[in-house]
Amino acid sequence: MIEFLSDIDTQLLLFFNGIHSPFWDYFMSAFTGKVIWVPMYASILYILLKNFHWKVALCYVVAIALTITFADQMCNSFLRPLVGRLRPSNPENPIADLVYIVNGRRGGGFGFPSCHAANSFGLAIFLICLFRKRWLSIFIVLWAFTNSYTRLYLGLHYPGDLVAGAIIGGFGGWLFYFIAHKLTARLQSDTPVPGKGAGMKQTEVMIYTGLLTLAGIIIYSIVQS
């Protein structure tokens, strides 16, 4: 059964990794970056400060940081050495010659689970639980999905790596939101209550910031290709 699932994982990887073009090479390489999304991350802090007392906002910022730390360490420091599954792009992997590599980027040694997927879905689930806004939820899930898919396109992860990472990150996002929500309920009772989206203000700022970043990536990719 494990061998069967591994074969399916490999075939899915080679199928999606094989769909490429100069435009998408630049797009995926840019989208998967961390620094380029700093403005969107800053907008999250802005929304928190607009809706909560600074002590409550700080508590949520710490909780988000713990979510990312949990996801990253669980994947990178604990599970990767334990499982020992080579990235498809790793030269020592038997299928490495079949994988399309973008700009010579091969990543590290092991790839299961994906830290990118874990971090992306950890943040997404945390914000969905916190803000409870439909359009923001749709946007952040699409962002997390695309961010994860870039790793497949770039040949850095198998689909199974991404699914496992998303599950781990999603659990971490829910867990640290739950803890932070319980703590902040004691800090301040007269702030908007997370879970009642109607009381949350200016959450669309994050969507606009993210879409502007996406537009910049698209323009960059068109020009470069």
Curated annotation (Swiss-Prot):
SMART domains named in the record: acidPPc
Membrane topology: Multi-pass membrane protein
Chief location bin: membrane
Gene Ontology BP annotations: lipid A biosynthetic process; lipopolysaccharide biosynthetic process; response to antibiotic
Effects seen without this gene: No visible phenotype in the absence of host gut inflammation. Loss of resistance to the cationic antimicrobial peptide polymyxin B (PMB). Lipid A is bi- rather than mono-phosphorylated, with mass corresponding to a 1- 4'-phosphorylated molecule. Increased negative charge on the cell surface leading to greater binding of PMB, increased outer membrane disruption by PMB. Decreased survival (fitness) in host (mouse) cells after infection with C.rodentium (a mouse enteropathogen that induces inflammation) or in mice subjected to other inflammation-producing stimuli.
Molecular function GO terms recorded: hydrolase activity
UniProt EC number: 3.1.-.-
GO CC annotation terms, alphabetical: plasma membrane
Pathway, per record: Bacterial outer membrane biogenesis; LPS lipid A biosynthesis
Residues that span the membrane, as ranges: 29-49, 51-71, 110-130, 136-156, 160-180, 203-223
UniProtKB keywords: Antibiotic resistance, Cell inner membrane, Cell membrane, Hydrolase, Lipid A biosynthesis, Lipid biosynthesis, Lipid metabolism, Lipopolysaccharide biosynthesis, Membrane, Transmembrane, Transmembrane helix
Function: Probably removes the 4'-phosphate group from lipid A. Removal of this phosphate group confers resistance to cationic antimicrobial peptides (CAMPs), inflammation-associated peptides produced by the human host. This LPS modification helps maintain the stability of this commensal bacterium in gut microbiota.
Stated family: Belongs to the lipid A LpxF 4'-phosphatase family.
Protein name: Lipid A 4'-phosphatase
Organism: Bacteroides thetaiotaomicron (strain ATCC 29148 / DSM 2079 / JCM 5827 / CCUG 10774 / NCTC 10582 / VPI-5482 / E50)
